[in-house]
Amino acid sequence: MSMKGQETRGFQSEVKQLLHLMIHSLYSNKEIFLRELISNASDAADKLRFRALSAPELYEGDGELRVRLSFDKDQRTLTIADNGIGMNREEVIENLGTIAKSGTKAFLESIGSDQAKDSQLIGQFGVGFYSAFIVADKVTVRTRAAGAAADQGVFWESIGEGDYTIADVSKEDRGTEITLHLREGEDEYLDAWRLRSVIGKYSDHIALPVEIETKNEEDGTVTWEKINKAQALWTRSKADVTDEEYKEFYKHIAHDFTDPLSWSHNRVEGKQEYTSLLYIPAQAPWDMWNRDHKHGLKLYVQRVFIMDEAEQFMPNYLRFVRGLIDSNDLPLNVSREILQDSRVTQNLRGALTKRVLQMLEKLAKDDAEGYQKFWQQFGLVLKEGPAEDANNKETIAKLLRFASTQSESSAQTVSLEEYVGRMAEGQEKIYYITADSYAAAKSSPHLELFRKKGIEVLLLSDRIDEWMMSYLTEFDGKPFQSVSKADDALDKLADETEEQKAAEKQLEPFVDRVKTLLGDRVKDVRLTHRLTDTPAIVITDADEMSTQMAKLFAAAGQEAPAVKYIFELNPEHALVKRASDVGDNEQFAEWIDLLLDQALLAERGTLEDPNQFIRRMNKLLSA
């Protein structure tokens, strides 16, 4: 084999790390290398079909796409060859020498020494071609891009360590041929029956024919036998597809090693005709919060693959959904730009969104434990829904889960339907509090009255919660009410007695004195009976920006208007009584500043001048 332009190049450092981790972590499930390589061949065939729609000459007179397996027991090699799109030299370097995924380095550094966990993570990452090194100590690739001249083939070879060799070679037929030089002890992959078994397990569902070489022992003639069904799984009747086949197809399209939580396979006829196969994964992808994270459905038009990651068919808050849509109503030459503005796309998006929400409703109803697993993985993403999808806001609200004062656990398990179902008699609102952490929410002084009255409060501590609640204003006809905002209904809950009213009258000069002292540092000063153990709190007016929202603005680098608090004092608390008796103005100011700082610290978690607070506290303690 004559080679030109030969050079040795080093792997990207992430590739070396991935190879090392993969070989050691995936060894117990090593047969998946065959699934990964056949899956790549299927993708290469899909890409050729799509490109050939506008350039049929790319078929080069051979439109029968397939992948072929052959082995040589003497040489101990296994070869997987396809006649798909193929690669040129630049594509080989990009696809086999680097990992073009942002966040890869951080992901690989996060992997520890737990092999079971590592294999899940690496599998989820999508090992693809590199899985060949699980069973091979050397891998040779010969490829030629469809439409390129025969002398524009590319040779690539590596032993899976620091570098690889690349060169230009001649290759008559297009496509990619991967030869695995098997490690000692891997002879099982030189057995036709073993290969049939693995392919039957992992690749029966793909539309690309998988053929295995058979030799006539008498005359040495070679024939190719198809060993998979080679019918696109989604085109088959649901009754003819087993759960195992659905699971394996998910792993094929999602490059995930774990079984999905649930799936929905539907064929729709009428105004629009399409087939959809949608999956809810069991775990979040490692890069779900990465800005460059690829998501979306595979798009087929009349069973012809058009594109991966068609984001237009699913709202962003459902970006974890995997699967495909096969439409009869879109043109074969559809582009991402056309999809963006297409009425067909908008209708499909609406229908598929409702389908996924129905899947989640069913999961929540039929399998509470399964839904809790889903919520732990994807709850934060689903919380984006009320802001993004006004049409389905009520349905999304039913799917939300919260921690609450009803439980001692931080687990988010309470649905809004459950909360409403056990509301206290006469309770008209759904009460909640937002905070930086579950502990801060649970210990907030704002909850004292509710504990006393036995009223449940939802405890919200995810960063997105405050933003979500600005869009989620009511559920089942009942408005949401933050317990840290001013509200007449909360004052009514306090059940103020005549005795308390009289005491308040006597304290009016004290309140006026506090107002004069604090001036415009606060919006107002008032007495409250919402507290039992705490001397003072700060709250915001109903129309004022909340503390948590101001923190969100700050975290995003945006300037938020200063929050003006209402300062509420508990007239029955010993510290407030003591402060009201102080005649000396300087000492009075120390007491009020201390009470205000305590209230601000409880509300915000920080103070502008903590040293001054400590100094003041020490001074009053030693007085």
From Swiss-Prot:
InterPro entries: HATPase_C_sf, Heat_shock_protein_90_CS, HSP90_C, Hsp90_fam, Hsp90_N, Ribosomal_Su5_D2-typ_SF
Chain intervals for the UniProt region annotation (C): 552-623
Places the protein is found: Cytoplasm
UniProt key word Transmembrane helix: no
Location of the region described as B in the Swiss-Prot/TrEMBL record: 337-551
Any Gene Ontology CC annotation: cytoplasm
Database matches in Pfam families: HATPase_c_3, HSP90
The entry's keywords: ATP-binding, Chaperone, Cytoplasm, Nucleotide-binding, Stress response
GO molecular function: ATP binding; ATP hydrolysis activity; ATP-dependent protein folding chaperone; unfolded protein binding
Spans annotated as A: 1-336
Main subcellular location of this protein, as a coarse class: cytoplasm
Record family assignment: Belongs to the heat shock protein 90 family.
Function: Molecular chaperone. Has ATPase activity.
Subunit structure: Homodimer.
HAMAP family associated with the record: HSP90
Protein name: Chaperone protein HtpG
